[in-house]
Swiss-Prot record:
InterPro entries: Bact_Transpept/Beta-Lactamase (IPR050515), Beta-lactam/transpept-like (IPR012338), Beta-lactam_class-D_AS (IPR002137), PCN-bd_Tpept (IPR001460). It comes from Pseudomonas aeruginosa. The modification N6-carboxylysine is found at residue 70. The keyword Phosphoprotein does not apply. This is Beta-lactamase OXA-11. One of its GO terms (biological process) is cell wall organization. It catalyses: a beta-lactam + H2O = a substituted beta-amino acid.
Length: 266
């Protein structure tokens, strides 16, 4: 098994509390090459405050967060009282939605798990531009640019975030260090649990901006963290996507890398 000490190219990340440096592990690129995918994976180990990536340049490049933005959106909704608590039910109005799994009443956890865009668009509209902007600044979340529409700025407009910034934000959430109540951070963390194995626990969220074109591809994300014994691993993956058939790769590629590092699986 490779270790973090084996990574060879070092660059300073002065902006992050998680890591004093990030190393480049080009051996991870074989997982991207095997699927003919352009993308980046950032993996950080909490105890050593160290991060690694397959691509230093792309790790700091900003992209639309797409539905990974449901994480801060949920926290902001709770902080502002738009979401009353974790038990609140978001009623379906009976009108057709883009996905059948959205056509039902949903709790906060349910809405996050099925990535119900209409629910979070309504939350954003009720939060409003002024409060949304205030919290994104407090969270140091990406470009903090919400122009283009309060219910779509994270889906198709100006908000951007890098893989490095994603793991910084997730670490702050994990440690309850965001400018938000501990209770509300705990609610959202619980809603993000996507795998509970005997040896580890995964909190995560996917994102997908749409396929785009070959010359102007969309972006697909998987971000989160793994709790294993006394260690925590934060991760962020994004990839270019011009064909929806490639969408499962947003999870399968980082999963293979984390399996090779002995973090999940087996």
């Amino acid at each position: 098994m490779k270790t973090f000490a084996a990574y060879v190219i070092i660059a300073c990340l002065s902006s992050t509390a998680l890591a004093g440096s990030i190393t480049e592990n080009t051996s991870w690129n074989k997982e991207f090459s095997a699927e003919a995918v352009n993308g980046v994976f950032v993996l950080c180990k909490s105890s050593s405050k160290s991060c690694a990536t397959n691509d230093l340049a792309r790790a700091s490049k900003e992209y639309l967060p797409a539905s990974t933005f449901k994480i801060p959106n949920a926290i902001i909704g709770l902080e502002t009282g738009v979401i009353k608590n974790e038990h609140q039910v978001f009623k379906w109005d009976g009108k057709p939605r883009a996905m059948k799994q959205w056509e039902r009443d949903l709790t906060l956890r349910g809405a996050i798990q099925v990535s119900a865009v209409p629910v979070f668009q309504q939350i954003a509209r009720e939060v409003g531009e002024v409060r949304m902007q205030k919290y994104l600044k407090k969270f140091s979340y990406g470009s903090q640019n919400i122009s283009g529409g309060i219910d779509k700025f994270w889906l198709e407009d100006q908000l951007r975030i890098s893989a490095v910034n994603q793991v910084e934000f997730l670490e702050s959430l994990y440690l309850n260090k965001l400018s938000a109540s501990k209770e509300n951070q705990l609610i959202v963390k619980e809603a993000l649990v996507t795998e509970a194995a005997p040896e580890y626990l995964v909190h995560s969220k996917t994102g997908f901006s749409g396929v785009g074109t070959e010359s102007n591809p969309g972006v697909a994300w998987w971000v989160g963290w793994v709790e294993k014994e006394t260690e925590v691993y934060f991760f962020a993956f994004n990839m270019d996507i011009d064909n929806e058939s490639k969408l499962p790769l947003r999870k399968s590629i980082p999963t293979k890398i984390m399996e090779s590092e002995g973090i999940i699986g087996g």
